[in-house]
Amino acid sequence: MEMDLVAHCGRHLSGTFLWTLSLTDIASGWTECVALPARNAELIIRAVDKVQKSLPFPLPGLDVDNGAEFINEALFEYCSAKCIALTRSRPYRKNDQVRTEQKNGSVARKLAGYGRLDGEPAAKAMNQMYMANRLFINFFQPSFKLLDTQRIGGKTVRRHDAPKTPY
């Protein structure tokens, strides 16, 4: 699964605000979101553990970006203990986690918006909202994958597979 964080900071990154941990399965597109009151390794480990228990399939690995909240000893030890492969994207490559970046917009941003959210009550409400929507998103909301991109003259032609639900 690809794993990424979405900031709910409004227009400014200063101060405290909520984060959404977004996990997307590469093969199926199954997506889970968890609201976090801060960006730290301990909260991420708790969220991954919670998500792992609710998945309808085993969690073989996590692919993360190069943030310090993901690349640390605590997450490495957790993944080693749970037999989860931990891989990271290439440095300075924004497009290495395209599946989860797409789901950040179509799931986390669509449900929570772009405004600033902070505080424990807001995190609790967001997690209730994510739990209420997870089955709809994964059982009934179809998505499709990009199969091929061709450049024909000055035009880009993209070919996608047939839309289907993650489950």
Question: What residue ranges belong to the model's regions?
Answer:
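Charged, gly/pro-enriched flexible loop segments at helix/strand junctions
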Residues: 134-167
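Active-site beta-loop-alpha junctions of metal-dependent nucleic acid enzymes
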Residues: 16, 24, 33-56
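Surface-exposed, charged/polar loop-rich segments
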Residues: 92-93, 99-143, 147
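Mobile genetic element proteins and their domesticated derivatives, centered on retroelements
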Residues: 4, 23, 29, 48, ...
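RNase H-like two-metal-ion nuclease catalytic core shared by retroviral integrases
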Residues: 64-66, 70-79, 86-112, 153-156
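Short, flexible loop/turn elements at secondary-structure junctions
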Residues: 5-9, 25-27, 38-40, 68
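Mobile-element integrase/transposase regions
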Residues: 1-22, 30
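Generic recognition of stable, solvent-exposed alpha-helical segments in well-folded globular domains
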Residues: 1, 43-46, 66, 70-74, ...
